């Protein structure tokens, strides 16, 4: 009988023995217990140099799906940029120099705006890249540089930005530059097409606000006193900076230093007035230069760093071998099972279909821990037997885990466990084999050792479970999963892919 494969990627669920703050261990998960006890499984590394990130760097959804789909270790923005910094090439990047030169055409009145997530989390950005850009701007003779700070509090601790702000205050003071505005990523980095949030961020950068600060650190402390954490800082502008007319205006230049694109695209769309979305901003500015750290898919920007090219990911190999495939995800992770899974390529393969399940629009997914998992499961079950390979993503462990709400994350995992129970029942006595993995850790550390919320990703390994009892699996990395699936389907893997994790000497055919 012809084998068919379901690859289910759980977003943000690592493996960890300790129970403290571990939503996975604390949740009641009879179906996961059955999967681990009755089926072949192994441990998969999903962080650091195992997935093309710096040593000990936590994994993330983009990198995870890139590695799973590529079948090889993908060196991503953070690694590429850090290498250039180490090799003293970063400041000589031609796209940065072009942005500097655009400002210097009228150095007295034009301003360079550096915007992005101020964090050492390394998921969307890294603060070291910002500091090097500031140094480079000074070395190139720029008079006016403004930094627009996006608070993180999600990929790092919820109230951790003051350490980074102190560094930024020191370097901007050294070169007589400014912290122009402060806002939470909730506003500046929305990706759910809630453009009112992006508009609020843009209006503040343009000076269209009466919410002021004069000292960045003091403003942040005041936000904390109102129980507002880094992610949700109310957008505010530096009053002194506004008085000097250094707000975002025509003929200024922007370098958006986030290297991860998904949460940078909407704000960038507003800034360059692209055609990517139907929404057009009422707040328009004519920039002399807009440079993005990496490619922001669908936007015409000056790209400082090109991503590693993945030309033959799993989806392409399946298509070339005549197999049909279906991708299923909700809005929050749809790009991950399509664009990122396909190596950063926006392509629809022959015999490929995609189904998008709408995410709940919510200020906090802790209020909706189930998210759209049930819709994903129902869609999967309705399409069994119609495709050779089905690839899907469950978003709720990651998105709810990011809230740091342990009880809600437990609920998310118990609901996810119920989904796997439904899937196991549906594929019983069929030729479908379920591969379950995760892209990175998160939900297994939802509280720190002091009981405080933990909202960031982790360096924990993840699972690989295969519902074929005839197999035995080696341990490996996320990049081993695609060749394992190809091996299982008896399709030769490309030379650039890593090895299959199936122990051939233990395997018997059905």
Curated annotation (Swiss-Prot):
Q: Which residues bind Mn(2+) 1?
A: 398, 402, 457
Sorted UniProt keywords: Glycolysis, Isomerase, Manganese, Metal-binding
Binding-site residues, Mn(2+) 2: 11, 61, 439-440
Question: Partners and quaternary state?
Answer: Monomer.
Q: Which reaction does it catalyse?
A: (2R)-2-phosphoglycerate = (2R)-3-phosphoglycerate
Family classification: Belongs to the BPG-independent phosphoglycerate mutase family.
A GO cellular component term found in this entry reads: cytosol
List the protein's name.
2,3-bisphosphoglycerate-independent phosphoglycerate mutase
Report the InterPro entries cross-referenced here.
Alkaline_phosphatase_core_sf (IPR017850), BPG-indep_PGM_N (IPR011258), Metalloenzyme (IPR006124), PGAM_B_sf (IPR036646), Pgm_bpd_ind (IPR005995)
- How many and how are cofactors bound here? Binds 2 manganese ions per subunit.
Q: Which organism is it from?
A: Mycoplasma mobile (strain ATCC 43663 / 163K / NCTC 11711)
Question: Which terms in the Gene Ontology molecular function aspect does this entry carry?
Answer: manganese ion binding; phosphoglycerate mutase activity
One of the protein's GO biological processes: glycolytic process
Per UniProt, substrate binds at 124, 154-155, 185, 191, 260-263, 333
Task: Report which superkingdom the organism of origin falls in.
Answer: Bacteria
Task: Give, as in the UniProt entry, the pathway in which the protein acts.
Answer: Carbohydrate degradation; glycolysis; pyruvate from D-glyceraldehyde 3-phosphate: step 3/5
Physiological role:
Catalyzes the interconversion of 2-phosphoglycerate and 3-phosphoglycerate.
What does UniProt list as catalytic? 61
Gene encoding the protein? gpmI
